[in-house]
Amino acid sequence: MFLDDLIIVKHQGKQFIKDLTKASLPEIFRGIPQIADETINTQELIDFCPTAAIFLDKNKLAIDLGKCAFCGDCQMQFPNKIKFTNQYKMATNNRDGLIVYQGETKEIKVEASLIRKEIQSIFNRSLKLRQVSAGGDNGNELELGACGNVNFDMGRYGIEFTASPRHADGIVVTGPISENMVEALQIAFEAVPEPRLFILVGVDAISGGIFAESTALKRDFLSKVHIDLYVPGNPIHPLTFINGILELTRKKYRR
């Protein structure tokens, strides 16, 4: 039992977090990556990524965290080129903000200029969300459930998940959005009273992930809605989600 407790502490940190905005995670956690200037076979690294998250932009390597599965294989194969930090604050309302370039120490955050005015004025004290799994694998769904447990307790900030979209202020989508879930997702979205939030959680929801080229997906619904927040991860960490929501809806938590 004691050994099990030590393993939990090593991988997840302390089991009760007093301040979710100042918490730190163990070094083993894979958060925002850094790309060094080390000379390698660039094409070999690009081809190595299973989700095409690594690419060249103006002769500089870049990683798109909206596509990254955070598998860590690139770091293991090219340890002198790529290193994942334990920085978990990487939710943003700017899709391009999820791209990390070679040689930079990236800070990913919610951009105040892109936040709709009504969000801050209406949802700055209480926020109810309806989660829709659109072909998800239960990984992100489990982590979202953990956001409300005694360890993270996002309810202390007035943030909760609700059973009905009619009782919600926004929709949280997980999964790559399979064709069979499009109608259900649209019904849930339209049932939420305006103004409503629309949040994509996890690599599958943001880009399709490893299923991006699958004919079973139908993601054109995303072009019809305003996306308020992207939360990268595979699966996401509760601290990433909670801090992203706080930055989006509460001015005092923005960096």
Q: Over which residues does each language-model region extend?
A:
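Ferredoxin-type iron-sulfur electron-transfer modules and their immediate structural context
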Residues: 1-52
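Flanking helices and flexible, charged tails adjoining ferredoxin-like Fe-S electron-transfer domains
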Residues: 1-3, 8-12, 16, 20-22, ...
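Iron-sulfur cluster-binding cysteine motifs and their immediate structural context
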Residues: 35, 43-92
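Structural motif
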Residues: 36-38, 66, 174-177
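Ferredoxin-type iron-sulfur electron-transfer modules in oxidoreductases and energy-metabolism complexes
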Residues: 45, 57-60, 191-194, 198, ...
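Cofactor-cradling patches in redox/metallo enzymes
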Residues: 142-144, 152, 158-226, 231-242
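Short amphipathic C-terminal alpha-helix that caps PH/PH-like domains
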Residues: 241-249
